[in-house]
Amino acid sequence: MARKKISVIGAGNVGATVAQFLAAKQLGDVYLFDVVDGIPEGKALDIQEGAPHWRYDLDVVGFSTSDETKYKNMEGSDVIVVTAGLARKPGMSRDDLFDKNVEIISDVSRNIKKYSPDSIIVVVSNPADIMAYALQKFTGIDPSKIMGLGGSLDSSRFRTFLAKELNVSVEDVNAFVIGGHGDDMVPFIRYSSVAGIPIENLLSKEKIDEIVKRTRFGGGEIVNYLKTGSAFYAPGISITAMVESVIMDKKRVIPCAAYITGKHADHYGIRDKFIGVPIKIGEKGVEQIYDIDFKPDELELWKKSVASVEASSKKVDEWIAKHAH
């Protein structure tokens, strides 16, 4: 059986951590790309040299894209993970990264389109829902093959905080977060439970509100501690879960930024944009989008999230119009 091929573009903390987790889970050969000379080669070699202890017989190889022809090495990738971009610094919101990152995504997109347009693509560069939209616009790739990190990580944080508060195994906590991957995310209390028991039966409203707030600013909390960068271990494993569901055709249901169109657009009140919703992930990418019903207070939060995504997506359209040759 031919081994799968996974390309990771961006060998910073997130990209390198993803590369290590993908290898550790033996999901396929990992090709790591970065514009900084030596970084992808060095990190890939370091991951490769741990193979005897991790017990993976896979190739982990790095390529510096300061020579753009090196992108040719991602040809025929089953999955491409795009983490290239600037990391957040204290005081920055995910949206502050917009201008720099859309430029980086434009370069990456050109090379994906040229060398590996049939891959399933996971977009991580912040703001991920907006960068997924930009990548789709730049490449023209079928949007069902593109998904953005967001809810997968936010839900993981939400589940962690709930499990710690209740002193139960994280495995028994089911919870999810939808909407934009930003301060407008919508943690869904009603659909959150411990072994099927609604969390509203287990925690006071005040305590739940506190956990929701911490989830919403979970990324910022880590940025404030680290000072020079943002989270990478939890994002790394959240991305790995998405890739694993594609490679193994697991059909996992995970909230991610997906392209909303057709009847889903009527339901969610947003059309032809990427926003975080529960999706089924399999070998074809986004295989199903689930429509969930909102109560009035949830709908209010959702609409706020939609407005924020619409405004940022419009900035992408303006950027493209300005830079069209």
From Swiss-Prot:
Its EC number is 1.1.1.37. NAD(+) binds at residues 10-15, 34, 101, 124-126. Catalyzes the reversible oxidation of malate to oxaloacetate. It catalyses: (S)-malate + NAD(+) = oxaloacetate + NADH + H(+). GO terms for biological process: lactate metabolic process; tricarboxylic acid cycle. SUPFAM superfamilies: LDH C-terminal domain-like, NAD(P)-binding Rossmann-fold domains. It comes from Thermoplasma acidophilum (strain ATCC 25905 / DSM 1728 / JCM 9062 / NBRC 15155 / AMRC-C165). It is an enzyme of class 1 (oxidoreductase). The keyword NAD applies. This is Malate dehydrogenase. Keywords: NAD, Oxidoreductase, Tricarboxylic acid cycle. GO terms for molecular function: L-lactate dehydrogenase activity; L-malate dehydrogenase (NAD+) activity. Belongs to the LDH/MDH superfamily.
